[in-house]
């Protein structure tokens, strides 16, 4: 395109046919120059020449909008801002990594790996401190992008990802799969972060605390124009789903990264293959030494078994691969002054001491508070108000007081005294024998507990009241509209218009969401009650075992321990909860308000043909939602596990089944497809 005389081109009358050809050529040329600049680091034209080509394309697209193509570089910034992000279910779960915090941890990981598959090489790469992103290309064109989310479901950030100039809208060349999912890290380079905060400072706006927060906030903008102004970058670090399965991929992780690079995707230049354990440690030390000089923030390095066949043999545990680990850098530490201690009250009444610190910059953020956990921790540290303390950001995330500096203790230092009465409601603070945590005895009489309990009650995994966010709950309680969860169902739209920034339309929508939440399941209801130590899985097991709330209310500790995965401690918490009159009053009020769920029929032996069996689901199911499939298998008596082992009875393999399928075949585990699973469900209705 450099040979085109742009001025003549734009001034001439051009036929639609010629315009379409020129626009396609310009798009291809600009996309190629983007890759040469951001990926190859070898630009072949100047910035001004690139700008002239771009301006030419912009003017032609304005004149012939019917010929604008999806991969045009002008389409990186979308038009209208979104109202909210849609949810995307990942075709293949986006797992997290286990951590190693020293040579001993990594050596133990290395031994586990080599004991299983023999000698290995590692592909080593910096652990970028950004946001994990999945990008799906179909026929070489960027189709969608999503955040990791909870690993199963993420948010659709396609329009924002398109604004990242280093991410190609169309893959380079023709030798790529029909469908390819690219996984990597979106991040904000240090220079871009400094420039962003400089602009904010000039406008007297709030500053971002670190590049990671800036990157996350930028990617979650509903207006992609804002994202485009933030100068984000991206490095690919793995492949996700690839279709067809027969496509020839590299046999090592490093080779696959080079394939990604050949398609025009940016890959870190700091990646290195290490064949020996000493080389891995040398790589770690080298990156750690150069950490402050790198153009981006990192919090460690990632070591992956390089051989793909060995990766498949090693497989996965519930939330992470067995063949990779994040070798974290030591947390950064600073000294500061303990100026005071505040006591906070949580949802379950836990009274937690929180240190008020002289603000100190550590690990990339300014820290002014840190939890002291409980009285035992205060005693262990021997800490007093007025002490100089050492602050560490554990894992570069959570501020933690790790020690005091005794020689700096002033004569005026004072003991930290736990309150005898709740700082919120004045009720007695109790510490049961054998427990580290002191608790307010006020229950829902305590405003702090009310707020946290009702936030939990309305949360997505509980009664899932759409629009009932934390700030709404806080206002409802502050304005004395709600005292207990049952009061939520007495709210009207007109009552909720009293809340800040709550118009009649929003209030009407929230009232409808509250009404809809009356229909739930026993498992969700039990989880929503906020019984100590009762999470989603335990609530589901309790619901399935007792089948009714009435039966559960009178269950003994002995009866409760008969429930799958319920131990003595959890059983005691459940029994104690249902023994409290004020809790029973709340439950009765909720039932009276109309909260209900379908009856659970106690399964007969014939209705549970899979009782005692362990099943595993893997790959993409086309006709079933994975959670529905899991629930139906559990109804038939099966235990649904997250990984394949010698104890697995059957693996359900959907599309792109991957390593779990290989492991099942290796162990001789029975494998069925989705059609067979549907037939099983149909036969047992």
Curated annotation (Swiss-Prot):
Its cofactor is Mg(2+); Mn(2+). One of its GO terms (cellular component) is cytosol. It catalyses: NAD(+) + (deoxyribonucleotide)n-3'-hydroxyl + 5'-phospho-(deoxyribonucleotide)m = (deoxyribonucleotide)n+m + AMP + beta-nicotinamide D-nucleotide. The keyword Phosphoprotein does not apply. NCBIfam families: dnlj, PRK07956.1. SUPFAM superfamilies: BRCT domain, DNA ligase/mRNA capping enzyme, catalytic domain, Nucleic acid-binding proteins, RuvA domain 2-like. Its EC number is 6.5.1.2. It comes from Shewanella putrefaciens (strain CN-32 / ATCC BAA-453). The gene is ligA. NAD(+) binds at residues 47-51, 96-97, 125, 148, 185, 304, 328. Gene3D superfamilies: 5' to 3' exonuclease, C-terminal subdomain (1.10.150.20), 6.20.10.30, BRCT domain (3.40.50.10190), DNA ligase/mRNA capping enzyme (3.30.470.30), Helix hairpin bin (1.10.287.610), Nucleic acid-binding proteins (2.40.50.140). DNA ligase that catalyzes the formation of phosphodiester linkages between 5'-phosphoryl and 3'-hydroxyl groups in double-stranded DNA using NAD as a coenzyme and as the energy source for the reaction. It is essential for DNA replication and repair of damaged DNA. Coiled coil: none annotated. GO terms for molecular function: DNA binding; DNA ligase (NAD+) activity; metal ion binding. The keyword Manganese applies. One of its GO terms (biological process) is DNA replication. This is DNA ligase.
């Amino acid at each position: 395109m450099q040979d085109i005389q742009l001025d003549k081109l734009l001034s001439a009358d051009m036929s639609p046919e010629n315009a379409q050809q020129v626009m396609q050529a310009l798009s291809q040329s600009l996309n190629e120059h983007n890759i040469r600049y951001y990926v190859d680091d070898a630009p072949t034209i100047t910035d001004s020449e690139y700008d002239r080509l771009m301006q030419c394309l912009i003017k032609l697209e304005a004149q012939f909008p019917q010929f604008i193509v999806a991969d045009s570089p002008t389409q990186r910034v979308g038009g209208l801002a979104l109202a909210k992000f849609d949810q995307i279910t990942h075709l293949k779960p986006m797992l997290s990594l286990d951590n190693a915090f020293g040579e001993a941890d990594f050596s133990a990981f290395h031994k586990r790996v080599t004991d299983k598959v023999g000698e290995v090489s590692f592909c080593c790469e910096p652990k970028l401190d950004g946001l994990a992103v999945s990008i799906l290309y179909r026929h070489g064109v960027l189709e969608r992008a999503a955040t990791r989310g909870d690993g199963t479901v993420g948010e659709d950030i396609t329009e924002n990802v398109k604004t990242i100039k280093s991410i190609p809208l169309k893959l380079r060349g023709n030798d790529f799969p029909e469908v390819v999912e690219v996984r990597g890290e979106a991040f904000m380079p240090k220079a871009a972060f400094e420039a962003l905060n400089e602009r904010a400072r000039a406008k007297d706006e709030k500053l971002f605390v670190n590049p990671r927060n800036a990157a996350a906030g930028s990617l979650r903008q509903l207006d992609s124009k804002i994202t485009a102004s933030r100068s984000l970058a991206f490095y690919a670090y793995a492949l996700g789903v690839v279709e067809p399965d027969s496509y020839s991929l590299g046999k090592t992780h490093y080779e696959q990264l080079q394939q990604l690079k050949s398609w025009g995707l940016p890959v870190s230049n700091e990646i290195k293959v290490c064949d020996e354990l000493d080389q891995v440690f040398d790589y770690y030390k080298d990156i750690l030494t150069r950490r402050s000089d790198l153009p981006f923030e990192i919090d460690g390095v990632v070591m992956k078994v390089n051989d793909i066949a060995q990766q498949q043999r090693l497989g996965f545990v519930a939330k992470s691969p067995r063949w990779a680990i994040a070798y974290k850098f030591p947390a950064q530490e600073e000294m500061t002054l303990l100026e005071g201690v505040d006591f906070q009250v949580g949802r379950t009444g836990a009274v937690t001491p929180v240190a008020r610190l002289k603000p100190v910059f550590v690990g990339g953020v300014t820290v002014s508070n840190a939890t002291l956990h409980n009285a035992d921790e205060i005693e262990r540290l021997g800490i007093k108000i007025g002490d100089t303390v050492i602050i560490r950001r554990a894992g570069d995330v959570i501020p933690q007081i790790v020690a005091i500096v005794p020689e700096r203790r002033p004569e005026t230092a004072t003991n930290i005294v736990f309150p005898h009465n709740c700082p919120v409601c004045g009720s007695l603070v109790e510490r049961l024998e054998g427990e580290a945590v002191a608790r307010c005895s006020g229950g829902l009489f305590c405003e702090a507990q009310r707020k946290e309990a009702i936030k939990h009650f309305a949360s997505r995994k509980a009664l899932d009241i759409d629009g009932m966010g934390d700030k709404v709950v806080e206002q409802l309680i502050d304005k004395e509209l709600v005292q207990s969860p049952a009061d939520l169902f007495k709210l009207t739209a007109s009552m909720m218009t009293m809340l800040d920034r709550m118009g009649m339309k929003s209030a009407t929508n929230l009232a409808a969401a509250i009404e809809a939440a009356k229909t739930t399941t026993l498992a969700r209801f039990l989880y929503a009650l906020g019984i100590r130590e009762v999470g989603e899985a335990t609530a589901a097991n309790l619901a399935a075992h007792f089948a009714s709330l009435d039966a559960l209310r009178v269950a003994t500790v002995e009866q409760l321990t008969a429930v799958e995965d319920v131990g003595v401690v959890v059983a005691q918490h459940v029994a104690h909860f249902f023994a409290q009159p004020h809790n029973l009053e709340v439950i009765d009020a909720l039932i009276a308000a109309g909260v209900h769920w379908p009856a659970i029929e106690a399964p007969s032996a014939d209705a549970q043909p899979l009782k005692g069996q362990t099943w595993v689901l893997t790959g993409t199911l086309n006709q079933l939602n994975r959670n529905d499939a899991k629930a139906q298998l559990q109804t038939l008596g099966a235990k649904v596990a997250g990984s394949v082992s010698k104890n697995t009875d059957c693996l359900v393999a959907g599309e792109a089944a991957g390593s779990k399928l290989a492991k099942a075949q290796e162990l001789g585990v029975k494998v069925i497809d989705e059609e067979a699973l549907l037939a099983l469900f149909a036969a047992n209705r």
